[in-house]
Amino acid sequence: MTTPSPAIGAFWRAFSDAQASLQALPLRERVGAANALIDQHLEGLALEMSGDDADAVVDLIVTAHGSIERFPLVAQVVAAAPALPHYRVRAFRERTTQPDFPIGMEGFELATSEVLVALEQDGGQAALEIRFGREIPSDYQDHARNMAFIMLDHVLGEYDFAVKVGAVDFVGAPDDAHTPWVPLSQLPPVFDRYWTETLGHTGHFPTGESEWDGLELQFDCPIDEDGNELSPDDINSEDAPETGVVMVNTSANAVAMRADLAYALTVDLAVPDSDTLTAVQDLQDQAATVLQVPQLGILVLTLMRAGRRQALYYVSDEQLAKQALAPLLLRDEAASLELKVAYDPAWSGYFEYAGYLSA
């Protein structure tokens, strides 16, 4: 695990020191005081508390308000939390247990039962089409849309809404009478079934031989001044697009976007000749086994391009994955290694290519 930053340590020390004074406050005021503390140390994060004034222990929720780039920081803050007798520390706003609720904004009220949702595929994510089940005055259209986003965050939970949901479009009367619409108040079980049954994200690691599919793609295609791709007859030989071959592990779709497989790790190696290519393929395949057997990660695709072979893995922990792969990366064929790691909970690096297979 990553060592907590000094800022995280300073925040938790300040919070621990303030526990006695915090406990003397009503819960609403306690939340405000706690946020004043976190604001001093950790930009972009906030604290929420779930419980009642009389509860001896309440949930202390660390949130990034849906900002994915701050999700790793949320996880680090929660992992570094000390023992707190009055708090259960949690990462991200969880789904509400009461999804049928109204909210008001500037004199306008809207209930989740009045927000209708249809689900569609958006790459590996779920796209949402939203319409309202009653007439919304023209002056409140923007309010209603903003309220719907707030509701979605509460109904689906902060992490799922930020990571699993793709495009969100507001529509008028439905064009297709057969499209199933569900009230937002009833969305969670419908969304979960769509996620596992329609999109195939069961969350279970594949067993046995993985299934692979391949395609040839062109990169750096020349375009005209309007951004349109040039026809082959209009391309000079020196401007010809670069060809690459991608092999996609379609079995990996089952664990796509699992919260514990959020880091994209790329092992990028030069393959100047056929012997080196064979050795690199063997190394990257062995790396896949080293990661997948303990379910530390999974190989999702390979890309041959410009004399290099890239293998993309999604892993649960950057440092543990690097430690597990370290002996393999000492081999001669790894001398040209470029090792890259990025936080990518939506698996965009995978669906950038897997999306072509279902297009």
Predicted segments with their positions:
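Short beta-strand->loop micro-motif that forms the acidic, two-metal-ion catalytic signature
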Residues: 309-313
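"Short basic amphipathic alpha-helical interaction patches in structured regions
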Residues: 74-79
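Charge-rich, low-complexity segments
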Residues: 1-59, 65-69, 80-286, 292-306, ...
